[in-house]
Design a protein with these regions (language model features):
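Carbohydrate transferase catalytic cores enriched for Leloir-type hexosyltransferases
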Residues: 1-193
Length: 193
């Protein structure tokens, strides 16, 4: 299979760390499929150095997430690659994309707390952003072949709030970074770094 991964958040915190760890570990265990990573141009060289795999193609795309360009230009780029499947590790999916895809939903925090307190946008702009988020996450969830939820409670929220059938949502817990697990081992064995 030819599988695409939206890795535009590769060097960001949170979802970016999830994405980079997912890619590194997936490429380590999967020797059968071919992968295409879509990364920001500014991250291209770093991703190429960090991930060495013969079955990997890296494409630089300067398309910001949550943008109009994402909805139109990114769809065209994805279509050109004729992918069998795309994984969007974040809710921001080009809703015009009509080939098979999987989406990871980490939480539905904006459904519960759409206050704007965590944003530096003016309230009217933030309200539009929340409406866009709700529209895109609902559309993407409906079109996705599968939805990855990072916990049972997130799965329950997806089923309840987005009205998605339970069997479409798969719970896959996020793993801990090796740096953390190695640190915990040293602490447990009372060793100093």
């Amino acid at each position: 299979m030819k599988i695409g991964i939206d890795a535009r958040l590769f060097n960001q915190k949170g979802v970016g760390r999830y994405t980079s760890n997912l890619i590194e570990n997936l490429l380590e265990i999967d020797k059968n499929n071919n992968y295409v990573l879509f990364v920001r141009n500014e991250d291209f060289d770093q991703v190429k150095l960090k991930i060495k795999n013969l079955k990997l193609k890296i494409i630089g795309v300067d398309i910001p997430w949550h943008s109009i360009k994402e909805q139109f230009q990114f769809t065209e780029i994805l279509d050109r690659e004729k992918l069998d499947l795309v994984h969007f590790p974040y809710f921001s999916v080009p809703i015009r994309y009509n080939r098979p895809f999987v989406i990871t939903i980490h939480d539905l925090i904006l459904h519960h707390y759409p206050t704007g307190k965590a944003s530096n946008l003016p309230l009217p702009s933030y309200a539009i952003k929340v409406l866009g988020y709700k529209y895109i996450i609902k559309k993407a969830s409906g079109k996705a072949k599968r939805i990855i939820a990072v916990s049972k409670s997130t799965k329950e929220e997806i089923v309840d709030h987005l009205k998605i059938k339970s069997d479409k949502v798969v719970v896959t817990y996020e793993g801990a970074d090796d740096k953390i697990t190695n640190q915990e081992s040293r602490i447990a064995n009372d060793q100093r770094p």
